[in-house]
């Protein structure tokens, strides 16, 4: 099965990434990706886009040549309280909010601190998807995080990039996360975490983890555009309402 949705990509606006929106659209057409989110790093990262970048994402068209675009952010979890670096009414203008730990913003400390910070971010109501929770630099109480994600309707990401170019040693943690998500009823999503358009929709390694634990694929948010759009609507993102008619032929 091909998965036509990618929730995690970075553009030239994050200056350690190398592609434009146009590049992603071209690759999406080649690969059969029907919906992707542009989610550049939140402003607290040293080379992140300016705050205005996210405010002005509204200028992006909803669909180009049959490919839908979600306007989003990969925010930074900043502290033990689970606060992120994007706020206020501006959050409600975005279609999708990802958040995770990044060393320049929230240096690794200990398992209890990481767990508390991640669970507080989940409970905040501001974050739709927790990115790369399997990062071995940030050990967490996996069962506690998965339970919170299930309770608060937040998805946990199995990050494909973690097995290829960064966060080496993530396999065991990601397998444990997928198992806990299955057992506790949490939602999973695969993210390419593309920093160059060629890797858009690349889920091979993440999918192997999901298949190994027999996680139900009908709960994967990547399974269809409507599956993700329905999830985001339930999360309170009314901004995606104008995308939904464009996928009226889709089966969630």
Swiss-Prot record:
Binds 3 Zn(2+) ions per subunit. It holds the Pfam family PHP. SUPFAM superfamilies: PHP domain-like. GO terms for cellular component: cytosol. The keyword Heme does not apply. Zn(2+) 1 binds at residues 8, 10, 74, 193. It comes from Shewanella sp. (strain ANA-3). This is Probable phosphatase Shewana3_2794. Belongs to the PHP family. Its EC number is 3.1.3.-. InterPro entries: Phosphatase_YcdX_put, PHP_dom, PHP_phosphatase, Pol/His_phosphatase_N, Pol/histidinol_Pase-like. Its cofactor is Zn(2+).
């Amino acid at each position: 099965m091909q998965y036509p949705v990618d929730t995690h990509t970075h553009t030239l606006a994050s200056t350690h990434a190398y592609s434009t929106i146009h590049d992603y659209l071209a690759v999406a057409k080649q690969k059969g990706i029907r919906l992707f989110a542009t989610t550049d790093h939140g402003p607290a990262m040293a080379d992140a886009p300016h705050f205005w970048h996210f405010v002005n994402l509204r200028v992006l068209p909803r669909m180009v040549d049959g490919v839908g675009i979600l306007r989003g952010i990969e925010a930074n979890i900043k502290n033990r309280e689970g606060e992120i670096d994007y706020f206020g009414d501006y959050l409600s203008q975005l279609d999708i909010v990802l958040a995770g730990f990044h060393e320049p913003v929230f240096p690794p400390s200990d398992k209890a601190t990481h767990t508390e910070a991640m669970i507080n971010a989940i409970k905040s109501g501001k974050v739709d998807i927790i990115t790369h929770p399997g990062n071995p630099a940030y050990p967490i109480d996996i069962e506690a995080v998965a339970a919170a994600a299930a309770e608060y309707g937040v998805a946990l990401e199995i990050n494909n990039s973690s097995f290829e170019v960064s966060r080496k040693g993530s396999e065991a943690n990601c397998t444990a996360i997928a198992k806990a998500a299955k057992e506790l009823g949490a939602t999973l999503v695969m993210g390419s975490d593309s920093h160059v358009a060629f890797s858009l929709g690349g889920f091979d390694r993440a999918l192997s983890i999901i298949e190994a634990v027999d996680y139900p694929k009908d709960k994967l948010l990547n399974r269809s555009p409507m599956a993700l759009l329905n999830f985001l609507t339930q999360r309170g993102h009314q901004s995606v309402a104008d995308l939904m008619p464009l996928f009226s032929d889709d089966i969630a």
